[in-house]
């Protein structure tokens, strides 16, 4: 009975994550929860029930039988299913919980179809198309990233990845070992370096929104926008590095074993399934662990901002000494 929400001296604050976001461990726990692919299998009834619980709780309507654990479970499913700004149900392939299975499939294709021109073109087109769905689904409700900008970013990232993949393939065409297998990672790293800055070019030019402790807008900073874009790009590349580097290394070792070499059917049919499985195991850990590298809501002292931004903030009544910004994912 003590676990009932109505019996709590201090009610749980579901406007913030359950775990302390000031520590890496707390952020990792939060992202392990929010990227859990099992939430994709929840029914429409379960999703609507969780939405009702969360919506009612925010307005002060609390069921007398609702437990703290049930509240947090409802919040987890609600956050993974509904857009945080619009409240609309997100397309299931674009949800963060679809990152592991979605990237698992695309990685298997990237690592298994790297030898031929059609394979390279199709796998990188498929991968960037999946990324575009994720970016579009998770765009901010107040985002100024237009459909045109999303499309241009998608085209540039896709063409960049294909160009690098085909160029490096030509350089290592006489190599059938590890060097050729690592080409997809180099292509993906460049695609992220193109896609993310282009997607957020509006923030880079106009500045990232800065808010005080009361969530009131107090200014915009190009410096923090550049830092945030760099952090997100780094975390995306770091997310891909373990499974896109280790998977080829493991597969390269497997192909050299006598067991593999003496079984032609394995050489013909098993490479993509094996690499997909290995990548999936890696993705289960790298997705939340790399999303947690940097705090999503970060703070900065006003005196460390650009001089023009400092003047703007200090001209306000009771100006804050510390401001906050959302770096994004």
Curated annotation (Swiss-Prot):
Amino acid transporter importing serine, an essential substrate of the mitochondrial branch of the one-carbon pathway, into mitochondria. Mitochondrial serine is then converted to glycine and formate, which exits to the cytosol where it is used to generate the charged folates that serve as one-carbon donors. May also transport other amino acids including alanine and cysteine. This is Sideroflexin-1.1. One of its GO terms (biological process) is serine import into mitochondrion. Belongs to the sideroflexin family. InterPro entries: Mtc. It is found in: Mitochondrion inner membrane. It catalyses: L-serine(in) = L-serine(out); L-alanine(in) = L-alanine(out); L-cysteine(in) = L-cysteine(out). Its main location: mitochondrion. GO terms for molecular function: monoatomic ion transmembrane transporter activity; transmembrane transporter activity. It comes from Caenorhabditis elegans. Coiled coil: none annotated. Keywords: Amino-acid transport, Membrane, Mitochondrion, Mitochondrion inner membrane, Transmembrane, Transmembrane helix, Transport. The chain crosses the membrane at residues 100-122, 150-167, 178-198, 232-254, 274-294.
């Amino acid at each position: 009975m003590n676990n009932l929400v109505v019996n709590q001296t201090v009610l749980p604050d579901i406007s913030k994550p359950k775990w302390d976001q000031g520590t890496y461990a707390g952020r990792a726990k939060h992202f392990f929860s929010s990227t859990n692919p099992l939430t994709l299998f929840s029914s429409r009834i379960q999703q609507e029930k969780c939405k009702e619980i969360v919506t009612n709780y925010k307005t002060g309507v609390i069921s007398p039988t609702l437990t703290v654990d049930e509240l947090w479970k409802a919040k987890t499913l609600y956050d993974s299913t509904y857009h945080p700004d619009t409240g609309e149900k997100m397309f299931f392939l674009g949800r963060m919980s679809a990152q592991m299975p979605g990237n698992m499939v695309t990685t298997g294709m990237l690592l298994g179809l790297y030898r031929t021109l059609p394979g390279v073109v199709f796998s990188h087109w498929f991968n960037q198309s999946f990324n575009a769905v994720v970016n579009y689904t998770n765009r901010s409700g107040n985002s100024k990233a237009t459909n045109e900008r999303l499309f241009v970013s998608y085209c540039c990232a896709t063409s960049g990845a294909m160009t690098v993949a085909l160029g490096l393939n030509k350089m290592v065409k006489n190599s059938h070992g590890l060097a050729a297998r690592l080409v997809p990672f180099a292509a993906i790293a460049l695609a992220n370096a193109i896609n993310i800055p282009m997607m957020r070019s509006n923030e880079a030019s106009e500045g990232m929104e800065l808010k005080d402790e009361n969530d009131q807008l107090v200014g915009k900073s190009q410096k923090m926008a550049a830092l945030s874009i760099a952090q997100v790009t780094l975390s995306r590349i770091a997310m891909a590095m373990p499974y896109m580097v280790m998977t080829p290394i493991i597969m390269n070792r497997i192909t050299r074993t006598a067991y593999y070499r003496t079984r032609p059917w394995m050489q013909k049919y098993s490479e993509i399934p094996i690499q997909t499985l290995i990548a999936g195991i890696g993705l289960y850990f790298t997705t939340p662990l790399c999303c947690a590298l940097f705090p999503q809501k970060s703070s900065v002292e006003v005196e460390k901002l650009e001089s023009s931004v400092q003047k703007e903030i200090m001209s306000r009544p009771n100006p804050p000494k510390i401001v906050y910004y959302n770096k994004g994912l």
